[in-house]
Amino acid sequence: MAAQASEKLQKLDLNGQSGDAEADAPAAGQTQAGEAEDDSDDDEVEDGNAAGEGAASGGGAKVQSSPPRVPLSTLFAGKEYPEGEIVEYQNENSYRTTNEEKRYLDRMKNDFLQEYRQAAEVHRQVRQYAQKTIKPGQTLTEIAEGIEESVRALTGHQGLEEGDNLKGGMGFPCGLSINHCAAHYTPNAGNKMVLQQGDVMKVDFGAHINGRIVDSAFTVAFDPVYDPLLAAVKDATNTGIREAGIDVRMSDIGAAIQEAMESYEVEINGTMYPVKCIRNLNGHNIDQHIIHGGKSVPIVKGGDQTKMEEGEVFAIETFGSTGKGYVREDMETSHYALIPDHSQVPLRLSSAKNLLNVINKNFGTLPFCRRYLDRLGQDKYLLGLNNLVSSGIVQDYPPLCDIKGSYTAQYEHTIVLRPNVKEVISRGDDY
C-alpha cells in the first residue's frame, strides 16, 4: 500500500512499535505436497472444490483448492511456513551472515518470522490464482472480493466477529488502480467498473497474521505493448530490494531505483514515452498492525539520510509512469485507517461515536474500506466516517492519480532485515 511522499505523509506522522525455519520446510510458493496445477479452469475449480470439501470434513487436503479456500493450517500441519528469498548482507555487513551472536538473535525471533511467512504464503497462493484468472470483462468488485475472500479463507479468519480481523486476514483493502490511477483505488458499493483489454491494473493487497502485514503488489496488462513499462518497474523494485539493508541510507536506495527505472522507455501508439518514477510515492516500513510505520523509502534521488535498522520490516515498492511522474488525489475515497495515538477529540455525532467503536473492535489501526463496513452490517455511516476524518481520528486515503491518458505500473515486496540475513518474505516464482 503506497505511502505518499509530500504533505500527506507529514500529515500522517504514523508511529508504531516495531530461529530459522527447519531445513526441510517447503520452498516459497509450494504446499507440503506441492501445488496441483491444471490448464483447465473447469477442472481446477471442480478438483479444488473437492479439496476444500475434504479439508472441511477432516479429510486433510494437502493441495490448495481453486479458488483458494483451504486454510494454510491444513496444508502446513507442522506450522513451519516457507522462507522467502534469503539474501546475504554484503560489504561491511557481510560478517552478519556467519556471526554467532547475530544467528542466535535471529533464532530468538522465530515466532515473529513464522507469522510473517504464513502471511506471505497466503499472499503467494492468492495472487498466483488471481494472476491466472483475472480477465477483461470482470468487474473490479468481483476481482477485489474474490481476492479478499481467498485471503480470509487461507488465514482462517473471516473477520465477522469482533476482534477476529485483528488476529488475521486482510492487511489492507485490495487496491485495483487502473491506468493513470496509481494507488489506493478499490470499488465502493455499487461500483460497476469493468476491466478492459487495454487497461493496466495495479493489484495491491495485504495479508496479515497477528498484525504482521505482508504488503506486495503486481501489475496486470493484457496488451504486450505495456511490457517495457512493467519490466521497468519490476527492475526498479528488485534494485531497491538489492540495495536495501541494515545501515543503508534511504537516499542511496532512491537514487539506485531511479537510475534503474528511468533507463527504460515504452512505445504506445507510435509515440515513445520515457518511464518516469512517480516521485511523490514511496515505500515504507511496516509495524505490527500499522501499514505505514513512519519511515519512507523514496524512489528518486534526494536528501533523506535516514538509515534502515536491524529488525525492521519494509515494503519496497516502486511506481513507473508514462505521464508526469507525480500523483494527486482524485476520485471517490474508499481507503481509511484509524490514526495511531490520535488526539482525543470529543465527538458530538452519535454516528461517529458508534462507528469509532466498530473500527476499534474490528480493525484497530489496520486500513479498511467502505465495503468492509458494509460487510459488517453498517449502514448510513458516511456522515460519521467523514466526521472522524475531519476530527483527525481517522485518515482518509483518496486515490492517487497521474495525468489522464497516462499509464502507471507498480511492483512491491516486503522484506525483513533479520540480524544475519535479509529475507524477501513475499518473493515467489511469479515475481
Swiss-Prot record:
Residues bound to a divalent metal cation 1: D204, D215, E412
Main location: cytoplasm
GO CC annotations on file: cytoplasm
UniProt cross-references to PROSITE patterns, sorted A to Z: MAP_2 (PS01202)
Keywords linked to the UniProt accession: Aminopeptidase, Cytoplasm, Hydrolase, Metal-binding, Protease
Ranges of compositional bias, category Acidic residues: 35-47
Cofactor info, note text: Binds 2 divalent metal cations per subunit. Has a high-affinity and a low affinity metal-binding site. The true nature of the physiological cofactor is under debate. The enzyme is active with cobalt, zinc, manganese or divalent iron ions. Most likely, methionine aminopeptidases function as mononuclear Fe(2+)-metalloproteases under physiological conditions, and the catalytically relevant metal-binding site has been assigned to the histidine-containing high-affinity site.
Region annotation (Disordered) ranges: 1-76
Entry protein name: Methionine aminopeptidase 2-2
